[in-house]
UniProtKB/Swiss-Prot annotation:
Protein name: Uncharacterized protein TP_0869
Lineage top rank: taxon: Bacteria
Length: 78
């Protein structure tokens, strides 16, 4: 269960790096409209990352419950 948040941090860092590096190179060569679109895109991706991180945490919790109590939780239907 401990590896989950670490993995999420790795994904978070990788996405940040993937967004940051091209933005540094592109920023000098784009029009104001493209800069605005890029800013909106980055804002959207930031909020998506937050949602994704929450989903990863929830998934980890579900996995922990499944491991602890077995699956399905109410016994197998036969």
């Amino acid at each position: 269960m401990r590896s989950c948040p670490k993995r999420a941090r790795g994904v978070h860092w990788a996405t940040g790096a993937a967004l940051w590096c091209p933005s540094r190179m592109i920023f000098e060569k784009i029009s104001p409209l493209q800069a605005f679109v890029w800013a909106v895109l980055r804002l959207f991706l930031k909020s998506f990352r937050t949602v994704f991180r929450g989903a990863v945490r929830a998934g980890c919790g579900v996995l922990a419950c499944v491991r602890a109590y077995g699956f399905p939780p109410y016994g197998s239907k036969e």
